[in-house]
Structures are given as C-alpha cells and as structure tokens.
Amino acid sequence: MSFLRNFFGTTTTAPEVQKEQKEPVRALPASWYTSQDMYELERRSIFSRKWLLTTHKHRVPNAGDWVQYDAAGYKFIVSQDEQGEIKAYLHDNSLSPVHVHIDRNGFIWVNLDSSETPEVAWTDDFDGVDEQPRFDYYNFDEYVFDHTWDMEGDFNWKILADNYNECYHCLVAHPDIPTIADLNSYYVKTKDGHIQHYGAQRQDQIDNGFRIATTYFWPNASCNVSPNFFFMQRFTPVSPTKSVMRYEVYRHKDATDEAFTLISDMYKRIMSEDKYLCIHTQKNLNAGVFVNGLLHPDMEQGPLHFQSTVREVVTQHFNKEQAAGHEIWPAKPPFSVDAPAIDETDIAFRTGMDTYADADNLQESLASNLAPAIAV
C-alpha cells in the first residue's frame, strides 16, 4: 500500500473527464499497469461497484440455465430461475444475490455492490446506450448463442482497453479491417461510460453483411454487432500483468454458414493480432524505463476517455478510503450484527494488504501524476 500514498499524496482532487481536449494529455503512468496495490484499488473502486456488461439473455434462454463468470477475482453466476427471471449470485458459500440489469436489447449487466441499492445507478453511466439509432438495423431477438472462446496473455487489462479504443494501428496491424470499413473515416463518440466507434462503409460492404456497430462499455467490455452475428468481449483481469480476453459469439438465426464463418473468423484473426500487440506493450512497461507519454486528443480520443475515467474513479474512491481510515470493499456483504467479532488482523491477512499507516508510495505517486494531467 505504500505505493498508493506516494502516488496520490495526502489528498487529491479527481480531475473531471474532459469532453473535448485541444492539447495532448498525459497518459496513465506505467506503474498503473504493473502495481499490485493499484490492481487491488481497481478491484475496490471499479469492479466492486460499477456496472459490468456480462452476457446476453440468449446465453441463459431456459429455466435452470446458468453460467459462471469472473471479474478481477470476483466469481459470480448468472442464471434463469424457474419463473423465467434472470438473476445473479456471488459464487461463494452464501450465494449472495448480485444486482442485475437487463437493457432493452437483452444484454445482462451486473453490479457487485453488496448494498441493497447500488451506489452507482446503471443510468449514471449508460443512460441511452441501448437506444443508439444504429441499433435500429438489428433485431437482437433474432440471434442465438453459438460459442465461446478466450485468450490469456501477460498484459494488464487496461492495455487491452487502450488498444481496442483507438485504430491508428489498424491499417498496419489488421489487414482485414480495410475490407469492412473506411479507416480514413474512423472516429469515436464518448459519453459517460461508453465509447461508440464509427467508420464509413461502402454499399458493397454493407451488402456483404458488414454493417457493423461497435461500442465499448466501461470498464472492460465491448460488443460488435452485424446482420449475421454479434460478439461480446470482456477483458478479465487476473493480476496486474495477466488478463483473459473472453468472447461470447451469437449468430443470427437466418445467417448462412458461409456468412457467419466469414465474419466470425475475421474477428478471431483481428483479436489474435491485438493480443500480441498488447503482450509487447506490457513487456515495455515491465522494463521499468518508460514512465508515461502523451495521448493525442483526436487520434487517441477513445483511450483518453477510458484513462480519464479510470483516473477519476480510482482517485475518488481512494479519497473516500482516506476519509474513512480503512479500505472500502463494496462487494463484501455487510457483517451481521449477530456474527462473532472479526479480528482486524485476520482481515488484513486475508486481503494481503498493508495497513494504511504504511500506504505512502501510491498516494505520492498519484499526486505527482494528477498534477501534470490536470495542467495539460
């Protein structure tokens, strides 16, 4: 924890997420992609309390269907009960219920906050995201679950998000993409907890089934939908320097084998190419030489929005913990008043975290990073 205090300083003011940047902005420092303390803070501030896009109702279409998921060490189950309701539970001894939201397109979101009402409402970050006009071209009820696949790699989950949300590398790294979209017209729209990706498409590309709508859902999920298929991608953190890229693939009920295989295999190639880009990026960060660079306000607008949101959320949570004098884990169920007293040393041992009295490094490190980020 000493890293945290050195980074943040005694108290910090979380910078607002900028809607429009005119000058380059300082990126997150390399230590945020390697530090165990920062990873634990992200587990508390992000994955314990924010809404996580997880799956689609077609994944559990029948009563009794269930699937286990994980997010930064939190394991939970999504199921359909005998009454046809979609529910979720922590995969622990108590099977504590998890908050669920199903949007108008059938996507299932979970919030691991153990409070009766989550601190963060779904509409706080995603109001209207399921009503994008471009979704009018698709009927999500006409798709069926087809298969899953995944890739594990030695990279921080944020590297995956940074890579996904810009495309100036696409022309060189992804030879398939120019066949389905005009990279010269690529741009993103950012709002609250989502990043919408756009690129003009020729009529022949649309006729071949490549009318594609792509959205990134902060913190760690995305969806690409086309007339023949859609796939969901989740960047699942395992440690500060290891993540799993998990995919759920859905097929339109009228898609031919040829049309479905064409686009499904293409995206598998693209995602595999991204994996190796991210592995090499993490290696550079692990070397300990690079500190942080600048983000271009236009070409890297997606990563800029993603990183600004990370910086804001973790800083606010750290300040809340400072005021409380202890770590705050929203996903942990409150202790019953009838339960035996908990030994504080036992809690510290289980979490593997140092006490706040030793948490100097992260606070100072954050403070030193936030100042230039705000100034620029």
Feature locations, PLM:
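C-terminal catalytic domain of Rieske-type non-heme iron oxygenases
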Residues: 3-4, 60, 77-82, 99-376
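N-terminal pre-ligand scaffold of iron-sulfur
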Residues: 2-90, 100-101
